[in-house]
Amino acid sequence: MLEIEIVYGLPDRQVLKTMQLAEGTTVRTAALQSGLDGIFENLNLHSAPLGIFGKAVKDDTPLRDGDRIEVYRPLLIDPKEARRKRVQNQEE
């Protein structure tokens, strides 16, 4: 058995869940079994980008004991555009 963590967060709420899974479980399978989509109603675990310890991974990546799966949210604004707006606001 593997013991892993899965995390998801919004600006006002974060959840970290510990799970016991069988050897050979993939990152996507673990995400789907986590039940996070029942806690966060707009979360689609079938398509949300996933990572392990800050690095994006493919859906079929097998998990290792102690891994932390991160469920990523889509960007609301392009980082370059956000920087441009910050600079523009500072100049005003």
UniProtKB/Swiss-Prot annotation:
Pfam families: Ub-RnfH. Gene3D superfamilies: RnfH-like (3.10.20.280). SUPFAM superfamilies: MoaD/ThiS. Belongs to the UPF0125 (RnfH) family. This is Protein RnfH. It comes from Neisseria gonorrhoeae (strain ATCC 700825 / FA 1090).
